[in-house]
């Protein structure tokens, strides 16, 4: 069984909040501020993660510019395009084969959040480095960035996906950092593919600009 390899979904990689950290606080008005760590928050605030049933941050945050392209970190299939109050717009995908990670052979479910827009649709097959969307700060975020998650998955006897570590305190997510390669997914693309991405990015920005004017 091949070991899992994830390729960085952004061209450059500046990690902000890491997996398991508990440094974000929230008040009754949904205002976010930084705490001093370990769930310690200013007066009137509580841990954002504990409030949402988590031990801490269940992914890694990577700094990004508005509309910065985000690329698929693995080969696989798009499961869904989702929009949530906390995480904003996101893309969820699954590998088509098992890999060895976290001590077993699992399918790798990767989740990408806080998008401005997406470039894929459910059930679409994607390859490492395919453009899947653009970074933003949708949902509850203090600025534009990519929230990236990894979850080990299996299929039950009915063919339904289930989360292997659902009760681990991170909604089944595990730290993706040990599986990240030095290369970005973008670096694996050909020059022609990169040109197509640039055209798609420009078209999306123009469309967004026109929509904002109407």
Q: Which functions belong to the PLM regions below?
A:
Residues 61, 92, 111, 134, ...:
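Conserved beta-strand positions that form and line the central face of beta-propeller blades
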Residues 55-58, 72-119, 141-152, 158:
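Zn2+-dependent peptidoglycan hydrolase active-site motif and core
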Residues 79, 133, 177:
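Nucleotide phosphate-binding site architecture
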Residues 2-17, 103-105, 121-127, 149-214:
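Acidic, glycine-rich catalytic/binding loops that coordinate metals and/or anionic ligands
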Residues 64-67, 106, 141, 170:
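Soluble non-cytosolic domains of exported or imported proteins
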Residues 119-144:
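Beta-rich strand-turn-strand
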Residues 64-66, 117-118, 122:
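Active-site acidic-Proline motif in GNAT/NAT acetyltransferases
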